[in-house]
């Protein structure tokens, strides 16, 4: 478990949980992960998530993964901007993930949002991850 990149740990937990057909995975708590989970829930990639508290007063999320006819809804989830190489884009130069079938999650000055909402708001930012 890499403590230098909690977003990559979160994405790997989701990917591994879907590949092993788990119904629920647990991920560490952070405000960025909470915002990403809200976007995944609103776009229909997960069934839901709850915030829990361990006996040692450490917060974590339980994420309910979504399947359609036994097939994971998330085909590909990947980290784009990494700690060693950041990836930024403007609102006009924002790429589309899988020709618009997937979505990028972007950290902007107005908060963390999907690429569609960032284009609509006219803001660019750091591309955190892509989901298809």
From Swiss-Prot:
One of its GO terms (cellular component) is ribosome. Disulfide bonds: none annotated. Transmembrane segments: none annotated. GO terms for biological process: translation. It comes from the Bacteria. Pfam families: Ribosomal_S8. Keywords: Ribonucleoprotein, Ribosomal protein, RNA-binding, rRNA-binding. One of its GO terms (molecular function) is rRNA binding. InterPro entries: Ribosomal_uS8, Ribosomal_uS8_CS, Ribosomal_uS8_sf. PROSITE patterns: RIBOSOMAL_S8 (PS00053). Part of the 30S ribosomal subunit. Contacts proteins S5 and S12. One of the primary rRNA binding proteins, it binds directly to 16S rRNA central domain where it helps coordinate assembly of the platform of the 30S subunit. Belongs to the universal ribosomal protein uS8 family. PANTHER family: 40S RIBOSOMAL PROTEIN S15A. This is Small ribosomal subunit protein uS8.
